[in-house]
Amino acid sequence: MARTKQTARKSTGGKAPRKQLATKAARKSAPSTGGVKKPHRYRPGTVALREIRRYQKSTELLIRKLPFQRLVREIAQDFKTDLRFQSAAIGALQEASEAYLVGLFEDTNLCAIHAKRVTIMPKDIQLARRIRGERA
């Protein structure tokens, strides 16, 4: 293809280029003089989804053992004083408690999704328990 000669043409309207030299220079020099780097933040929801995947993969107990043990002993005091517990009994209670709570939160999440929400609320827990027949 043969080359053709370019002729100068008059511009027809269009935006004139703005002068950004001063602002660009100021923007580039400002962070370097401050020296304080902004900490990295993930977008809202990213960490929550990562935690959901992590805890769904794992099988370890999520409630700390000693606080749970204190709670069990405190509740048992109302029924009989000076009760003693085997460590396996406390472990079984904790396993059952966490399994119950996980199931309840799964049902609660379904109730929230049914209401076209992504945030669970106390009314979702109440509805889930009512459907299960745990509470009238």
Swiss-Prot record:
<feature type="modified residue" description="5-glutamyl dopamine; alternate">
    <location>
        <position position="6"/>
    </location>
</feature>
<feature type="modified residue" description="N6-(2-hydroxyisobutyryl)lysine; alternate">
    <location>
        <position position="15"/>
    </location>
</feature>
<dbReference type="GO" id="GO:0070062">
    <property type="term" value="C:extracellular exosome"/>
</dbReference>
<feature type="modified residue" description="N6,N6-dimethyllysine; alternate">
    <location>
        <position position="80"/>
    </location>
</feature>
<dbReference type="GO" id="GO:0042692">
    <property type="term" value="P:muscle cell differentiation"/>
</dbReference>
<feature type="modified residue" description="N6-butyryllysine; alternate">
    <location>
        <position position="24"/>
    </location>
</feature>
<feature type="modified residue" description="N6-methyllysine; alternate">
    <location>
        <position position="5"/>
    </location>
</feature>
<keyword id="KW-0158">Chromosome</keyword>
<keyword id="KW-0238">DNA-binding</keyword>
<feature type="modified residue" description="N6-acetyllysine; alternate">
    <location>
        <position position="57"/>
    </location>
</feature>
<feature type="modified residue" description="N6-butyryllysine; alternate">
    <location>
        <position position="10"/>
    </location>
</feature>
<feature type="modified residue" description="Phosphoserine">
    <location>
        <position position="87"/>
    </location>
</feature>
<dbReference type="InterPro" id="IPR007125">
    <property type="entry name" value="Histone_H2A/H2B/H3"/>
</dbReference>
<feature type="modified residue" description="N6-succinyllysine; alternate">
    <location>
        <position position="57"/>
    </location>
</feature>
<dbReference type="Pfam" id="PF00125">
    <property type="entry name" value="Histone"/>
</dbReference>
<feature type="modified residue" description="N6-(2-hydroxyisobutyryl)lysine; alternate">
    <location>
        <position position="123"/>
    </location>
</feature>
<feature type="modified residue" description="N6-methyllysine">
    <location>
        <position position="38"/>
    </location>
</feature>
<feature type="modified residue" description="N6-(beta-hydroxybutyryl)lysine; alternate">
    <location>
        <position position="28"/>
    </location>
</feature>
<feature type="modified residue" description="N6-(beta-hydroxybutyryl)lysine; alternate">
    <location>
        <position position="15"/>
    </location>
</feature>
<feature type="modified residue" description="N6-glutaryllysine; alternate">
    <location>
        <position position="80"/>
    </location>
</feature>
<feature type="modified residue" description="N6-acetyllysine; alternate">
    <location>
        <position position="15"/>
    </location>
</feature>
<feature type="modified residue" description="N6-glutaryllysine; alternate">
    <location>
        <position position="19"/>
    </location>
</feature>
<keyword id="KW-0488">Methylation</keyword>
<feature type="modified residue" description="N6-lactoyllysine; alternate">
    <location>
        <position position="24"/>
    </location>
</feature>
<dbReference type="GO" id="GO:0008283">
    <property type="term" value="P:cell population proliferation"/>
</dbReference>
<keyword id="KW-0539">Nucleus</keyword>
<feature type="modified residue" description="N6-lactoyllysine; alternate">
    <location>
        <position position="19"/>
    </location>
</feature>
<feature type="modified residue" description="Citrulline; alternate">
    <location>
        <position position="9"/>
    </location>
</feature>
<dbReference type="GO" id="GO:0000781">
    <property type="term" value="C:chromosome, telomeric region"/>
</dbReference>
<feature type="modified residue" description="N6-acetyllysine; alternate">
    <location>
        <position position="5"/>
    </location>
</feature>
<dbReference type="GO" id="GO:0007338">
    <property type="term" value="P:single fertilization"/>
</dbReference>
<feature type="modified residue" description="N6,N6-dimethyllysine; alternate">
    <location>
        <position position="28"/>
    </location>
</feature>
<feature type="modified residue" description="N6-succinyllysine; alternate">
    <location>
        <position position="80"/>
    </location>
</feature>
<dbReference type="GO" id="GO:0035264">
    <property type="term" value="P:multicellular organism growth"/>
</dbReference>
<feature type="modified residue" description="N6-glutaryllysine; alternate">
    <location>
        <position position="57"/>
    </location>
</feature>
<feature type="modified residue" description="Citrulline">
    <location>
        <position position="27"/>
    </location>
</feature>
<feature type="modified residue" description="N6-glutaryllysine; alternate">
    <location>
        <position position="24"/>
    </location>
</feature>
<feature type="modified residue" description="Phosphothreonine">
    <location>
        <position position="81"/>
    </location>
</feature>
<dbReference type="GO" id="GO:0000939">
    <property type="term" value="C:inner kinetochore"/>
</dbReference>
<dbReference type="GO" id="GO:0000786">
    <property type="term" value="C:nucleosome"/>
</dbReference>
<feature type="modified residue" description="N6-methyllysine; alternate">
    <location>
        <position position="123"/>
    </location>
</feature>
<keyword id="KW-0991">Intellectual disability</keyword>
